[in-house]
From Swiss-Prot:
The gene is cysS. A motif ('KMSKS' region) lies at residues 264-268. Belongs to the class-I aminoacyl-tRNA synthetase family. This is Cysteine--tRNA ligase. The keyword Cytoplasm applies. The lineage of its organism: Bacteria, Bacillati, Bacillota, Clostridia, Moorellales.
Amino acid sequence: MYLYNTLTGRKEEFTPVEPGRVRMYVCGPTTYNYIHLGNARPMVVFDTLRRYLEYRNYDVLYVQNFTDIDDKVINRAREEHQAPLVIAERYIEEFFKDADALNVKRATLYPRVSQHIDAIIAAIATLVERGFAYVADGDVYFEVEKFPAYGRLSKRTPGEMRAGARVEVNTSKRNPLDFALWKAACPGEPSWESPWGPGRPGWHIECSTMALKYLGPGFDIHGGGADLIFPHHENEIAQAEAQTGCTFARFWLHNGFITVNQEKMSKSKGNFFLVRDILKRFRPLAVRLYLLATHYRSPIDFDDAGLLAAERGLERLENTRRLLGEARCQLTGTGAETTVPARTSALAGRAEELRQEFISAMDDDFNTARALAALYDLAREINSYLNGTTTIDPAALRTAAITFEQLGGEVLGLFGQARQQVDDELLSGLMDLILQVRQEARQRRDWATADTIRDRLKELGIVLEDTPRGPRWKRS
């Protein structure tokens, strides 16, 4: 497996430090608002990477934080006349609603800044003690010039970094690039006691502290959006490596922006679309497919056409699942699995070929666009097989069905959650029973009953089709 490492600027073969186990950290949201589609992209991208690693038999320790102490959270709390942590808790709950809708699996751990203040203070104290940080008027700053490797991740010159950093006029700083590790308390803001006086953590020290606490130095993958490369991830590296003297993270993966008219989608620009609003118009799994249909490092320029195409693509995959479900029900219901003679079939072999194409795509810097193409090809092969034969080879069908479910559901997460699967299985079982009753009526030449069943099903949105292999059904 090869992944593009932002740190080195090239694809590198990925092997975890600990055989069979991957340690992975992804920057989570600042919890002051509902998430927009740009926030959702790293959620889906790194969830799918985690799923794929698990499919390849890795045990993944996946940590994603919540930034529940931040200027934005405090400002929203002032606007709504509530405590900052109350605001944060509300939007954490909303985050999980959107994540569940998009079929994002729960991370192993969701550490919150507010629960790690002691660890953050200890990390800052170490940096001060080692000479990488200084105290000024109750604030504590990281001294960038003391860390010679600063700029290694973003490949920026000092001048470019000054232009790109969130630099405020501050005469307490020795260098405009120096960044806050600890902010002295201000009236009306949450604060904690520290060796430097009451205050709260800076943004960057929060992530590096939690990552080191749960994953240790030299962990395997650190992920996030490309907008975090500088200054956030650059600063994380400086803080962590200045503390430990060890590599912070080995592979740095960054997803591309979602743009609107070629401009980055962001709350600050007001050109964002909330996930909760998009889900009122498009199905959640179609939105997930939309985010996976482009290579994760490439930008996506948002428009309805792409989401409509994703809806159609999802319908193609769901149609194949329906055909597979019908075929399995017919085999199970008729005992055909033991009575139908096996016939030479290329389906099983073709399913394995396409599985290897899928793996090859995912192993090449996690290319979900190519992997989806292999999945669509497999759907086409299954459809052709089921629509073109009156005698099913159960073993071939089972192989193709398992492969299809693993790649589309287990890895890409496009086939819904357990509740929907149970509902689909229940519907398939009920339809199998109804079709059996109708078939018995036809055998008795009770055409009125058979026609009534067909007509009532049509009223309920289910269309029957009589084929040489027996009746089939589909949602209208």
